[in-house]
Amino acid sequence: MLIHALMRNAVLLFTTVCLAHSSWGDEPLRIAVAANFRNTLADINEVFERETGHDVVLSSASTGVLYNQISHGAPFDIFFSADKDTALLLASDSTSPAAGDAFCYAMGTLVLAGGDGSLNQLADPANSLAIANPSTAPYGEAAMVVLGREEFASGQNRKLVRGTNVIQSYQFWFTGSTDLALLPKALAKDATPIPKQWHPPVEQFAVALSTTSDNKVLARYLDWLGSDRVKAMITEAGYEPCS
């Protein structure tokens, strides 16, 4: 009886360990993504999940909000920033969880949505305008640079509504709460492009927060990101390739 009991316990222990290892292997890839790129990355991830069987979980907010979450220990495997500096800051900070160099994944384009399509609308104070919060969102920061141009000084008394991120800014405009919005092209493909020389380039960088040696799914995902197929999906979404 004692032998049978010991054997039964050994089998239970072996089964428990196997199940534990199985659950470890089945953990989803956890990704933090800037709001402007969320929908594009969701489409990319849908194909990755279908072809590999690996699950991906997205958390989306403005770049500044996500940076604060990561700095305070939020458990992400990779971070897609809407700018270059934030990703580089994580990659170079010895106290951060970054596990590799930051890399460019897309170049953003700022557009003016609404009205008659003329950029001169920005000079009219009667036109209310939505932008993302420039303190936490790179597209909002770029928008403020554009609004600071001399030819738009007459519009400085306009109603300016700041969304927590570009998605909320888009919603302000789309629902009619504002007349105009300065947005990423990916959210309003038919809107009027802002000349690139009017603001610093919106270079969107990502950085891995887990080591690929410990996370084989992340290694496979990073390879997938560099494929021509994914690059084509990013371009189709309204972004430009990295220079």
Where are these regions (language model features)?
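Bacterial N-terminal signal peptides
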Residues: N9-A20
